[in-house]
Amino acid sequence: MKKLKENLPSAFNRYILPNGLRIIHEPSASKVAYCGFAVDAGTRDELENEQGMAHFVEHLIFKGTAKRKAWHILNRMENVGGDLNAYTNKEETMIYSAFLTEHFGRAFELLTDIVFHSTFPQREIEKETEVIIDEIQSYEDNPSELIFDDFEDLIFLSLIHISEPTRHAQI
């Protein structure tokens, strides 16, 4: 494992494993710990015919692995007072757990199993399709979400428009 020095606060240690996996560790005396996997891909990385896939995968990873059914996944951390969750945004997809430090091994093993061995059962794909459709409809019925999207489009589209002349300038 190679230890890196980057622009992180000194309280953080950052490592890169031989397989390229990056680890950021913050030592703490707290009795509560957090562990997660972040994938540097979110909705912004989807092609037009892939829209919604990052969010869909985020839901499906909880539906089964090669050695666990969905209820095993959900109960694994809850049984020891921990929490398991995930989110997707425009920049990343994240799965994480909060737990008492004594259960780090349990949390890390579960997250690793989910990230590397999810099975995406067909019956769960069909069920989750309905859940995602409901979430999209709820999102589209929320004016504050739509206003934020419009605002973001105005900002970023104006930045693209402003920078276009310099990108295409002939020298």
Describe each PLM feature range.
Residues L154-I160:
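Short, basic/glycine-rich phosphate-binding loops at helix/coil junctions
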Residues A54-E58, K127, A169:
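Residue-level micro-sites within transmembrane alpha helices that shape
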Residues M1-I73, E109:
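His/Glu-rich zincin catalytic helix
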Residues F151:
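Rossmann-like NAD(P)H-binding beta-loop-alpha module
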Residues I160-I171:
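Single conserved hydrophobic/aromatic residue that forms the stacking wall/gate
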Residues I61-E145:
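Active-site-adjacent, His/Asp/Glu-enriched structural segments that form or flank metal-binding
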